[in-house]
């Protein structure tokens, strides 16, 4: 899958492209890079034009230089980075799927560029702002990262993204994701956590989306709880919902075949709309 680079706000940003047809951009989440979509990439590449970025500070992309006073706008900056990638690729409209933090970025993109989307997918993600308890948890995470470093934090937090049964049965998969996270800096993870903590509620954005919206939800997700996910599913006018039983926050790995089938059906639906 060919890799490309562009410069955004003075930082070098990496992304991959492959395939032809409906443009589909896959945005990874916190503590990941574009390779987290490996199973979806393999499944979709012969059917769609895939664009898979490494977000700033992830994978082969450089971190953005952000003032500590501007953390409330960082998710918007990431969304603007995605727009620049689409501009460079001369993609006027696309279907955008975001995992976790990637979903927050996709929603920011939808708020400012609704005319550029023909479909949106939230994969274990939420339009709601962080609750008070969630913000407290993230701030504790920032303290841990600053004290012990990025790798130690991810080594402890990544297993919690998976359902207990999957973790027991597939320790190699957990280790593979931890290995992918080996290049993160503490500064990058802190920037992500601050950005997520300060991001606004985007339920109004979700309500205004006229194109199809897909929700992929983990029944055992401890990061985006099932009951919270269900509250947002009825906000858009054209919704598809897939609840994955026995799955936590990583359906792309925990139930890759079911996730792939769900995404394929959604993208075909968008193509025919």
Predicted regions and their residues:
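Active-site loop/oxyanion-hole signature of alpha/beta-hydrolase fold enzymes
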Residues: 8-16, 39-45, 51-97, 112, ...
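Short beta-strand element of the alpha/beta-hydrolase
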Residues: 22-29
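Serine-hydrolase catalytic-loop signature spanning alpha/beta hydrolases and amidase-signature enzymes
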Residues: 29-39, 50
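Alpha/beta-hydrolase active-site loop signature
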Residues: 31, 55-62, 127, 248-251
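Conserved hydrolase catalytic core segment
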Residues: 88-131
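Conserved alpha/beta-hydrolase catalytic His-Asp/Glu region
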Residues: 129-136, 148-208
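Conserved loop-alpha-helix segment in the C-terminal half of the alpha/beta-hydrolase fold
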Residues: 208-248, 253, 258
